[in-house]
């Protein structure tokens, strides 16, 4: 389990450009979306913003219940992926045992069926890995973590895939392997936020190994080099 980590959503708010895309979307027949459907999209996006705000305020169960209603009643396929990714994360954050297995399956199908937009694919994979660990499907989690390392070209994605592998080793209590992977990430990256994410995992590993002094020193270094890492505004 993480220590001192403030709840952070993986899902960032849609910006104006994203919304313009939704509003002007042309269907497969070359026809513009009807006005009523546009209004539904706008209303749903506003509701998703409200859910995120509630979650960031620490009211996770309230946010989850509101999102579940949105998900169950959504009729616009264009919004399915956005809703599912946020829903999946809140399932993890609320530790919802009732929904975690079905959500893992649903997200896995969405990814493997290419229903997730490329820009959201990394987020979806990382959430799926956490879902798999939560239901003790370690080999599945490792497969998807390695997939992230293999299929993404950018260094940030590869680093996050390696950090996920370290989390899996940590889950298996193989702290030596977990630490090795984290040190590889730290030695390769020049990105301050990636380094902070990796160091935070190493902090957990140190605590689990009983190395409290080293953990405390590491935390001081994280806060000194990247004080915004634990703020609610930070997006992984």
Language-model segments: residues:
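Sec-dependent signal peptide recognition
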Residues: 1-8
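Acidic, polar-rich low-complexity tracts and alpha-helical solenoid repeat scaffolds
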Residues: 6, 15-236
